[in-house]
């Protein structure tokens, strides 16, 4: 859904000083957090901007939103600066990562990265307002024909972290961009496929979880990447 910025090269040049200002401006607008989306390739600049913003009074929780295909040493550069991690666990079978995402050893890298994230934040902790203030929400998008792999992802999450993390099981897959190159996923997810995964989450005892209801796989939910406030 985000191919426009992830593969299309769309974006704006921003200096580290301007990024610091953006963080502070978002706080002034009443944002509940600072969310960094797929930020790994700008880690050094983000670290510098966060240090500067926090020195100028930034108090908002910082959220690191990632596909989890990351190196632990990169993540540790932000130790003490990130409060919440939102990693995806896309595949248990790394062959699916090679096929659909063009990356090798996806699960090996992602699982180690997610462990590192947990070590940096510890168990999930909610504030008095009911919002997550520290910890991790691990997200998983169920793909057509891959509900068994989804169940294996949930098994690993629950066996590794128990109730110390939140889990979000998503049904919002949309067959766009290069999905046409893979006929088996060039269709929406069925309700039955999604229900099988949700049922499995319940059976293995996941209690801190989110599920999606209604029609979420629609174009209206794709953000307008127009660079507002940048």
Put a short name on every predicted segment.
Residues 50-51, 78-79, 101-103, 223-228:
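Short low-complexity, flexible loop/linker segments enriched in glycine and/or proline
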Residues 49-63, 109-120, 189-200:
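Alpha-helix-loop-beta-strand connector modules within alpha/beta enzyme cores
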Residues 1-85, 93-94:
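Conserved Radical SAM active-site core
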Residues 5-6, 43, 68-71, 89-107, ...:
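Conserved radical SAM core fold
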Residues 27-52, 97-99, 105-106, 115, ...:
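Conserved glycine-rich "GG(E/T)P / GGGxP" loop and the immediately following alpha-helix
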